[in-house]
């Protein structure tokens, strides 16, 4: 597969997962309304070819299903993402190999890292057209406004690239930007993010911070930029590790930064420390409008793009959204890393409906009383991204944590609310979460939905009903003989069981 956005669009079209829309659409509200309906139904990616006010087409919902995200990462099944997670786990906490086989596996990972180093493109497609000076007008890019209460037009899937003015180490993040004028935008990032750290360092040295925004990149690179990695590692290296070969980079025209050579658009500008403008409100992943915050102002002096570029975008909100699908894929990648940190956890799942981080379901191979509570506490402290997880449900390894019917059964049949529910008060809390009494401070809940063993219970636990293994195998062998071979039992319609989805 080609390592650019166009190659991915072509792949989706070949596999029947892209629809081209030739009717004129408005980037103000209409594009998002159409796309949201497709997202709710798990529909195909969309390419709007006739966008009001812009000569450029808009691509959206390309990563609207887990299947398509797997394709973006050159995979066919979500389980393959765990193999990638195993590589990252080795790199994060390498251990001396105890066996020859372990040494060979680690050697393979190191070889993959060597292959993943970025390359250079001295005649990049992203600079086929250069616009600067008085000709620069960001309104030419078909930026969308997703919700009626949004403050303005936004960029959502741009790679925001900055560099540490001391070490030269780049940071690549996916941050929201709001259009302020034809040459300026505000960037919304948390104080702990790499771009914010770089801006503070530039301020300490009395320098402007150079910024590049790469739009319309290979979705695989977006996934790499969204992966929490150690501060001193490069997202370009991670993207190469994800894709199996290095990312081709190009030097910007007016700033000392590098961007993916096959980007559809590149914006080049600077931030003067202390120069801020109000940013927001905008609809966010919590399903509400966020607040208004003073955010750094980026002044752009140059725009480059490919010939006939395609603008890639998305928007936040209540799941399902593309960000939720990305989170499900990252969930699989984190799994081996989490197992390395907390060995008793056999699997974990962050349900999309819980915003992909507010609630976690973890399974354990239970061996002693109190283990479920220990596993929940260990989960909260294992990785920084679990800091704001409000609910942790612990189940036995026999429970399919990705089947809500099994999880609800485990809670209903194995939990005594007095004994098995524990609350941690006054813990760090997501500032975007309105549920807490105090901003930034709230509680957490753990639920032990495992089978209880003495001394957790004083009575004998019931025996779980199971089919006879021999008969189950016999029925599977004779299924077609019964005349039922045309019935697919692997795809379940929840609406047949009382749900309204």
Curated annotation (Swiss-Prot):
Q: Which GO terms describe its biological process?
A: ubiquinone biosynthetic process
Q: Could you tell me which Gene3D superfamilies the record lists for this protein? A: Single helix bin, UbiD C-terminal domain-like
The record's listing under InterPro entries reads: UbiD, UbiD-like_C, UbiD-like_N, UbiD_Rift_dom
Q: Name one GO molecular function term.
A: 3-octaprenyl-4-hydroxybenzoate carboxy-lyase activity
An example GO CC term for this entry is: cytosol
Q: Which domain of life is it from?
A: Bacteria
Tell me its family: Belongs to the UbiD family.
Q: Which PANTHER family match?
A: 3-OCTAPRENYL-4-HYDROXYBENZOATE CARBOXY-LYASE-RELATED, FERULIC ACID DECARBOXYLASE 1
Per its record, how is this protein called by name?
Uncharacterized protein sll0936
């Amino acid at each position: 597969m080609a390592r650019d956005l166009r190659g991915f669009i072509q792949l989706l079209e070949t596999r029947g997962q892209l629809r081209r829309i030739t009717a004129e659409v408005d980037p103000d509200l209409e594009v998002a309304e159409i796309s949201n309906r497709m997202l709710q139904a798990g529909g195909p990616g969309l390419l709007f070819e006739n966008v009001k006010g812009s000569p450029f087409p808009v691509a959206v919902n390309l990563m609207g299903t887990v299947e398509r995200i797997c394709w973006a990462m050159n995979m066919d099944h979500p389980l393959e993402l765990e193999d990638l997670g195993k590589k990252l786990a080795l790199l994060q906490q390498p251990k001396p190999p105890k066996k020859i086989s372990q040494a060979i596996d680690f050697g393979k990972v190191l070889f993959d890292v060597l292959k993943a180093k970025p390359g250079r493109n001295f005649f990049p497609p992203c600079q086929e057209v250069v616009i600067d000076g008085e000709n620069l007008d960001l309104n030419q890019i078909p930026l969308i406004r997703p919700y009626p209460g949004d403050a303005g037009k936004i960029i959502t899937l741009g790679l925001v690239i900055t560099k540490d003015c001391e070490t030269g180490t780049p940071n690549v993040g996916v941050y929201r930007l709001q259009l302020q004028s034809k040459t300026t935008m505000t960037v919304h990032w948390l104080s702990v993010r790499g771009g914010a750290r770089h801006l503070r360092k530039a301020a300490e040295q009395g320098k402007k911070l150079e910024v590049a925004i790469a739009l319309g990149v290979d979705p695989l690179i977006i996934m790499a930029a969204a992966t929490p990695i150690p501060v001193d590692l490069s997202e370009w290296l991670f993207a190469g590790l994800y894709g199996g070969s290095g990312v081709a980079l190009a030097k910007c025209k007016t700033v000392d930064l590098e961007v993916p050579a096959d980007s559809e658009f590149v914006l080049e500008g600077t931030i003067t420390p202390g120069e801020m403008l109000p940013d927001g409100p905008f609809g966010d992943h919590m399903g509400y409008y966020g607040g208004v915050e003073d955010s750094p102002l980026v002044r752009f002096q140059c725009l480059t793009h490919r010939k006939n570029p395609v603008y890639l975008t998305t928007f936040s909100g209540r799941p399902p959204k593309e960000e939720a699908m990305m989170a499900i894929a990252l969930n699989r990648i984190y799994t081996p890393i989490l197992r390395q940190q907390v060995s008793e956890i056999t699997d974990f799942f962050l349900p999309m409906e819980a915003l992909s981080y507010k609630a976690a379901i973890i399974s354990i191979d239970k061996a002693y009383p109190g283990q479920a509570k220990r596993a929940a506490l260990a989960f909260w402290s294992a990785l920084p991204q679990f800091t704001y997880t409000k609910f942790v449900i612990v189940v036995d390894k026999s429970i399919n944590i990705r089947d809500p019917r099994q999880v609800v059964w485990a809670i209903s049949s194995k939990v005594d609310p007095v004994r098995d529910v524990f609350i941690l008060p006054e813990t760090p809390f997501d500032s975007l979460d309105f549920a807490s009494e105090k901003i930034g401070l709230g509680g957490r809940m753990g639920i032990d939905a495992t089978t209880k063993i003495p001394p957790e219970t004083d009575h004998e636990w019931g025996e779980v009903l199971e089919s006879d293994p021999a008969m189950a195998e016999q029925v599977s062998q004779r299924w077609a003989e019964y005349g039922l071979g045309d019935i697919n039992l692997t795809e379940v319609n929840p609406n047949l069981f009382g749900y309204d989805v």
